């Protein structure tokens, strides 16, 4: 496998992890609606225990996503995670707060009360998807950073800082771009949609299911409007292309539309993903008995996000544009690890299907029985 193929292969794997992370944020979506889907303490505990079965999947995928980026594209890791640290610290803090809230809300000696920790889960359910969506949007809209490539390691002499943020906001400036917020809120509403569909499928309670069906309508409308608006914005906006020979980066009109036309199979994946998400939503709204909407909508989410991330990084495109210095923009060619590192990791990645198979098996084992009120009396309940 050539160096170029390895770069594309690892961009695909990182994109797949990112897509799975967005799907698994149904945990955050459901948690953001604890007080909306649950009308009393028992129903709220049902929702918390339902998402409590899966929150570790989301947290682990978030960490794995960051680790895969660090290993395969270390310059992005140091630039974004090291430069935009306020944005990423808030995201990580909200996820840590989630873990603490699950474990301590009903413990003996909890002086704050269960409702306080439930509100913390709601906070994570809002901030997590919103900020992650905004961070992903910077792949298309750019960020304010500078990469001093002359400061790379020169022989055995270590040079000063390679990448730095161009202002004192350290990532919070991403929230000042309206289009970053558009995708951020689109991901937030998508997480809520997936959360509703998951709870309807996982919790055996008619009151929660009926309430979820109603909430699904009010959540789907803003999601569709925001997502379509962002998609139109992306395909019509100027993109950032790089010359594979010289590495020079230039602005190209409607670059992302060209990517979808050139990489036609990515466009097909995007279309199939969108159709599956809409199918899962519409069928759940129309049918009174259908509770399996999480599966077509979940698979559609993975395909849609995967296609968007592939569009951002393939076909000689700068996946992390710099608004401060165009030539500092990051590509899969100038930000990746060495050929040896990518080759070794590619061999190890053969084990990924086995890990995914184990996750599917664990998921099936956990969900073999639908959650009901009887399980709240067990010692393992949150």
Predicted regions and their residues:
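N-terminal signal-anchor module of multipass membrane proteins
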Residues: 1-59, 63-66
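Juxtamembrane non-transmembrane "cap" segments at the membrane-aqueous interface
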Residues: 144-158, 306-327
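Transmembrane-helix bundle segments that line or gate the permeation/cavity pathway
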Residues: 24-32, 52, 60-108, 124-154, ...
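Juxtamembrane helix-loop boundaries in multi-pass membrane proteins
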Residues: 43-63, 88, 114-128, 157, ...
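Long, contiguous internal "core" modules enriched in hydrophobic/ aromatic residues
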Residues: 108-290
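Short, membrane-exposed interhelical loops at transmembrane-helix boundaries
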Residues: 248-254, 320-341
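Alpha-helical transmembrane segments
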Residues: 8-22, 82-95, 126, 174-190, ...
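Membrane-interfacial helix termini and the short, flexible loops that connect transmembrane helices
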Residues: 30-44, 73-77, 99-120, 199-212, ...
């Amino acid at each position: 496998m050539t160096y170029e193929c390895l770069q594309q292969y690892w961009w695909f794997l990182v994109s797949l992890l990112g897509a799975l992370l967005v799907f698994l944020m149904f945990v955050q979506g459901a948690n953001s609606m604890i007080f909306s889907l649950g009308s009393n303490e028992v129903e709220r505990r049902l929702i918390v225990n339902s998402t409590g079965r899966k929150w570790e999947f989301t947290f682990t995928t978030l960490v794995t996503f960051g680790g895969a980026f660090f290993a395969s594209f270390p310059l992005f890791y140091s630039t974004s995670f090291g430069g935009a640290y306020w944005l990423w610290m808030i995201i990580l803090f909200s996820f840590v707060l989630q873990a603490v809230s699950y474990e301590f809300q009903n413990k003996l000696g909890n002086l704050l009360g269960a409702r306080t920790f439930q509100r913390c889960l709601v906070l994570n359910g809002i901030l997590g998807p919103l900020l992650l969506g905004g961070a992903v949007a910077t792949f298309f809209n750019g960020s304010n950073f500078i990469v001093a490539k002359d400061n790379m390691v020169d022989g055995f002499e270590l040079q000063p800082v390679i990448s730095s943020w161009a202002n004192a906001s350290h990532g919070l400036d991403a929230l000042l771009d309206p289009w970053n917020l558009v995708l951020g809120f689109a991901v937030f509403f998508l997480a809520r949609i997936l959360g509703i569909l998951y709870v309807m499928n996982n919790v055996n309670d008619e009151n929660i299911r009926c309430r979820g069906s109603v909430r699904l309508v009010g959540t789907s409308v803003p999601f569709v409007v925001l997502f379509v608006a962002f998609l139109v914005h992306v395909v019509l906006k100027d993109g950032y292309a790089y010359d594979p020979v010289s590495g020079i980066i230039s602005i190209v009109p409607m670059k992302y539309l060209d990517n979808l036309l050139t990489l036609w199979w990515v466009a097909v994946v995007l279309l199939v993903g969108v159709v599956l998400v809409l199918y899962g939503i519409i069928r759940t709204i129309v049918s009174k008995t259908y509770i399996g909407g999480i599966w077509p909508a979940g698979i559609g989410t993975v395909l849609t996000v995967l296609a968007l991330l592939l569009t951002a990084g393939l076909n000689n495109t700068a996946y992390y544009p710099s608004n401060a210095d165009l030539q500092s923009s990051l590509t899969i060619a100038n930000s990746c690890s060495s050929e040896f590192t990518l080759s070794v990791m590619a061999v190890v990645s053969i084990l990924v299907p086995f890990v995914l198979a184990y996750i599917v098996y664990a998921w099936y084992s956990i969900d073999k029985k639908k959650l009901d009120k009887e399980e709240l009396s067990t010692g393992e309940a949150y």
